[in-house]
Structure formats: structure tokens, C-alpha cells
């Protein structure tokens, strides 16, 4: 007996409560589970209620970490592959640093975009993105298309913070043909308090000892707009410590954007490098990779594996 739902006019009713969950033990060290439910809470009393004033599904994800569990064995990366494991500028790659390694990036460009990133590998095949923060600044989109999207996530006082993970599925380090990784992140713009989900399915191929390339389908999901995209990039070794990185991204939607980036990476060591780049992407953080601005910008990024 009783009601478990009310609408915006405080009309009470009964609604069925549902829940669907999926768990995956990736290896003895790391497990992931996700859940979709319209239940308001996890306690016996709140679990019978829908969320206030609505009956919408809620999404959750949990990570189980066992520090002393056995990890998936991967052969160590050689120095050339280790130098590309810091990824590109606007197109990521599928490599994951080995367990226990911290990945740090700092980025700034001539338009005032500023971003910082910290990731930690819980396993040889799973990296947790603990900190991905920054702001887009002085973006000129040259028109009003996608104006609501821009004002919601890239407005004048935006500050975006994000959290996510990167899961390695295939790797030549365990005799697969190429690297394949699933990466997802969630977060919001602190100024508008609006968030989005960003996912990508990253494929990295090592062609020979001086060339590797990436193909990365991407998807942006939000309450304002949702659309897909795809990124292409390559790593061209000019010398042992100097690399050219050309990149292209395009969104798949009405009024699609096509942006390009050209970067030059100097490696002080396989773990430390400096990127100089020229790009008309809105920025290096998630949504910025799929949007184009009117003017090209010069940027710099510092990369560390510790």
C-alpha cells in the first residue's frame, strides 16, 4: 500500500521500481560494475521511491580494486612505444602505462586554454583518470551554430572537471595485432552545473619502427545535445627523440565540425616529453576535441610518466 512517486504538481501515484546491473571482473586485481535504476536510494526505505518529482533512470558505476590481486601480464613497452603512451593532443591512443605509474600532463595555448591531467594505473590494463580539469578561453566559433552547447559547456566563466577510466582490451604486449582501449569520462562545467558523458573506442596500430597510427570513434552524450565523431592521427618518428603528430577530428551531426592539429614532440627521455602544436580544435579536453574554432592557436604541453 502507499505511493512512491509524485510529479511537479504533487500528484501522488504508484510506480514500479526496476534495476539492472552488470558486473565484470577484468582480472583478479580490478573489477567494474554498472547499474541502471529508477530507485531513489539504496536503503530499504529509499529503495522503494523514485527520484523526487520525476521517474527517470539513474546511472552508477563502481570500481573494485584489490591491491594484492594478480595482474594481467604484459611485456614491457620499448622506449619508442613508451614515448607515445602519453597520447596525442586531440586524439588519444590506446596504450596504458604499466601498473603503479602516474601520468601527468599540463597544457596551455595562445588563446588562454589551460588544462591539467593526472591518471594512475591501477593495473597493467586499467588506468584511473583521477583529475582532468581546466577551462576553455576566448573561443571564436564564427557563428551561432551549437550556441546552446557552447554556452553550457564552453561559456565565458567555464571550469570543467572530469573523472574517468581507460581499459585496455587488446595489446601486442600479449600477442594481439594492435592496441584496443575503451575510455570513458564524466564531469561537469562548474559554472553552469551541467555535465556530459564522453566515450571513445581507441585503436592504435604500430606499422613499423617509425610509424604508428590511431583511429578513435568518439561519442558525446548530454541533455543539451548528443553526437558522435571520429579522430585520426599518426606518430611519425623523425629521429629517436623527435616525433611529428598530425591529427584530424570530425563530428558526425548536423553542422559537423572538422578540425586539425599538427604537433611536434621532443622527448627528453621515454618518460618525459614536450609538445608544441598548432590547432583549430576548441581544446584538448573531451568535448573540445570534436569542435572547431575559427582561428588556429599555438599551444604547449608537458608530459610525464612517473
Where in the sequence are the language-model features?
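Short catalytic-loop micro-motif centered on adjacent basic/acidic residues
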Residues: 104, 245-248
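Active-site cofactor/substrate anionic-group-binding motifs, chiefly glycine-
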Residues: 129-131
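Short loop/turn motifs that connect adjacent beta-strands in outer-membrane beta-barrel proteins
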Residues: 26-32, 70-78, 94-99, 125, ...
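Outer-membrane beta-barrel translocator/channel fold
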Residues: 1-66, 135-168, 173-202, 206, ...
Amino acid at each position: 500500500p502507499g505511493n512512491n512517486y509524485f510529479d511537479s504538481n504533487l500528484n501522488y501515484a504508484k510506480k514500479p521500481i526496476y534495476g539492472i546491473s552488470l558486473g565484470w571482473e577484468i582480472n583478479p586485481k580490478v573489477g567494474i560494475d554498472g547499474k541502471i535504476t529508477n530507485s531513489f536510494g539504496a536503503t530499504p526505505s529509499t529503495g522503494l521511491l523514485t527520484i523526487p518529482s520525476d521517474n527517470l533512470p539513474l546511472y552508477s558505476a563502481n570500481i573494485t580494486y584489490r591491491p594484492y590481486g594478480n595482474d594481467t601480464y604484459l611485456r614491457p613497452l620499448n622506449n619508442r612505444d613508451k614515448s607515445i603512451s602519453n597520447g596525442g593532443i586531440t586524439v588519444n591512443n590506446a596504450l596504458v602505462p604499466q601498473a603503479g605509474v602516474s601520468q601527468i600532463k599540463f597544457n596551455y595555448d595562445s588563446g588562454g586554454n589551460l588544462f591539467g591531467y593526472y591518471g594512475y594505473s591501477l593495473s597493467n590494463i586499467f588506468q584511473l583518470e583521477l583529475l582532468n580539469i581546466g577551462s576553455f578561453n576566448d573561443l571564436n566559433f564564427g557563428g551561432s551554430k551549437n550556441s546552446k552547447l557552447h554556452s553550457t559547456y564552453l561559456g565565458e566563466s567555464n571550469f570543467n572537471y572530469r573523472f574517468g577510466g581507460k581499459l585496455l582490451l587488446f595489446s601486442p604486449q600479449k600477442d594481439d595485432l594492435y592496441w584496443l582501449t575503451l575510455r570513458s569520462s564524466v564531469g561537469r562545467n562548474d559554472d553552469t552545473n551541467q555535465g556530459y558523458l564522453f566515450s571513445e573506442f581507441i585503436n592504435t596500430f604500430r606499422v613499423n619502427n617509425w610509424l604508428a597510427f590511431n583511429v578513435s570513434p568518439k561519442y558525446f552524450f548530454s541533455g543539451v545535445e548528443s553526437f558522435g565523431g571520429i579522430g585520426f592521427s599518426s606518430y611519425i618518428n623523425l629521429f629517436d627523440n623527435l616525433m611529428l603528430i598530425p591529427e584530424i577530428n570530425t563530428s558526425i551531426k548536423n553542422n559537423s565540425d572538422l578540425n586539425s592539429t599538427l604537433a611536434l614532440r621532443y622527448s627528453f627521455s621515454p618518460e618525459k616529453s614536450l609538445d608544441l602544436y598548432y590547432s583549430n580544435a576548441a581544446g584538448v579536453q573531451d568535448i573540445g576535441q570534436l569542435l572547431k574554432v575559427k582561428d588556429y592557436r599555438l599551444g604547449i604541453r608537458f608530459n610525464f610518466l612517473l
